[in-house]
Design a protein with these regions (language model features):
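Functionally constrained cores in energy, signaling, and assembly domains
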Residues: 4, 15, 86
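Cysteine-centric segments in proteins
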Residues: 23-130
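C-terminal segment of classical bacterial N-terminal signal peptides
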Residues: 13-21
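Bacterial N-terminal signal peptides that target proteins for export
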Residues: 1-8
Length: 130
């Protein structure tokens, strides 16, 4: 009689723990030019990176800032500004640590936007100075 409840509980737990980071409630501060869909896509990419590099994909909060056109990118994977785009710096509280990312965004020829994510720092304790 208890077996169905145990199985149902196990299934519910597996479903909850397998949700991507972007499906969870995330606190956003700062400014971004990203649409809600692009913001979600970027967060999914960062969550994949966090999972691969640290074994955890939970993103609690994100602070976003648009960088000036004079910004010199760190190891750019794409020349966003020459493609009509821009750079942003996102600071995430992910998995109990802070990490900063350079986000390049530019218009896509297929419609919408393309982007590239470059880690600027490793994982740092939340109490560490920026």
């Amino acid at each position: 009689m208890k077996l169905p409840y145990v199985l149902a509980g196990a299934l519910a737990l597996a479903t909850l723990t397998s949700q991507p980071a972007a499906a969870q409630k995330i606190s956003f501060t700062g400014y971004t030019k990203a649409s809600p869909q692009l913001r979600l896509d970027v967060l999914r990419r960062i969550a994949q990176y966090s999972k691969a590099s640290g074994g955890c994909a939970f993103v609690f909060s994100a602070h976003m800032e648009i960088l000036p056109r004079s910004y010199v990118p760190v190891q750019p994977s794409m020349p966003a500004t020459s493609r009509g785009g821009h750079f942003e710096r996102w600071t995430l509280n992910a998995c109990g640590a802070r990490q900063r990312f350079q986000i390049a965004m530019w218009p896509s020829r297929r419609g919408g936007s393309d982007f590239a994510v470059t880690p600027l720092t490793g994982r740092r304790p939340l109490h560490a100075r920026r």
